[in-house]
């Protein structure tokens, strides 16, 4: 298999807007008739992430037509799983509502933070949100004791015709000490649900690490030409903050969404020689828009330089 992506450039740079803060991290698309809404995470001065959005012209994805200048969801109550940060991950429509699966953040003591998955619901087509529950729908568990976060979801049918929600998410393996600081190591796992809320977790590893300190983040999965295609980002546990071990976008394919063949070398979308994506490519989100396969993604600094997009021009099996 080979792929040919055309970079279309940066869409949104938070540094160019006086109301924005420091980041436009984890671009998360939702389609409308005439626009594409991109939820993303900015950060307050104290480093806590919050979620807001911009709207893009559906016919010209490089054109921002609306900028939302406030958080769409506040922090959780003290002691809850998201009292220190709210970061988008996947948006979908359900029963006249918009559901936003998001990553909640707690600051840690022995390690820097803990992450879990929550659901926020919008009754006004994706402008304001409320929590479906005060607690997480995906959390640490006996077999996965560290992190469960950044889901992507496909809604399908099981062999009996019943609803089947399929999720790919990040699961922590451990925290490893690097130059006196604990860094998280995590992989991509799979779970499923009948209702999108309660998840059966078979502890199924999707992609083995290439080395013990490799960490994955933000899988995005689509069905295309009879296959499941997954993009993600991966990094080392050392020197990964825009250094030699920084995030790069990777790729894998699967016949069933469970067992994956890693094919990073066919992706055809590495860092550029200079500019906003010169040291890092990260947090891909792939979606089909009007017959085109489009990837929204971050560049340097985990979204500090904003987000852009690329279009898949050719895929050969």
Model-identified regions with their sequence ranges:
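Conserved active-site neighborhood of enzyme catalytic/cofactor-binding cores
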Residues: 285
């Amino acid at each position: 298999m080979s792929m040919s992506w055309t970079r279309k450039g940066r869409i949104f740079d938070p540094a160019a807007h006086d109301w924005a803060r420091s980041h436009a991290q984890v671009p998360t698309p939702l389609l409308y008739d005439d626009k594409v809404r991109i939820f993303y995470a900015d950060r307050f001065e104290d480093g806590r992430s919050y979620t807001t959005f911009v709207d893009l012209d559906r016919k010209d994805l490089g054109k921002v037509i609306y900028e939302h200048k406030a958080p769409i969801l506040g922090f959780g109550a003290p002691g809850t799983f998201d009292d220190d940060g709210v970061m988008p991950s996947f948006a979908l429509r359900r029963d006249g509502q918009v559901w936003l699966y998001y990553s909640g953040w707690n600051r840690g003591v022995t390690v820097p933070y803990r992450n879990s998955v929550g659901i926020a619901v919008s009754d006004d087509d994706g402008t304001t949100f409320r929590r479906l529950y005060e607690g997480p729908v995906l959390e640490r568990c006996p077999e996965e004791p560290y992190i469960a976060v950044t889901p992507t979801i496909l809604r399908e049918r099981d062999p009996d015709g019943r609803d089947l929600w399929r999720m790919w998410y990040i699961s922590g393996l451990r925290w490893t000490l690097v130059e006196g600081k604990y860094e998280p190591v995590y992989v991509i796992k799979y779970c499923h649900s009948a209702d999108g809320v309660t998840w059966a977790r078979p502890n199924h590893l999707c992609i083995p690490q290439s080395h013990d300190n490799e960490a994955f983040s933000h899988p995005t999965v689509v069905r295309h030409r009879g296959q499941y295609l997954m993009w993600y980002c991966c990094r080392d546990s050392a020197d990964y903050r825009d250094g030699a071990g920084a995030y790069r976008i990777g790729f894998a394919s699967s016949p069933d969404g469970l067992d994956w063949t890693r094919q990073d070398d066919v992706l055809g979308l590495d860092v550029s020689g200079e500019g906003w994506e010169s040291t890092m490519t990260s947090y891909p989100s792939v979606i089909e828009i009007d017959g085109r396969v489009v990837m929204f993604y971050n560049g340097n600094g985990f979204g500090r330089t904003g987000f852009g997009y690329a279009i898949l021009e050719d895929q050969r099996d």
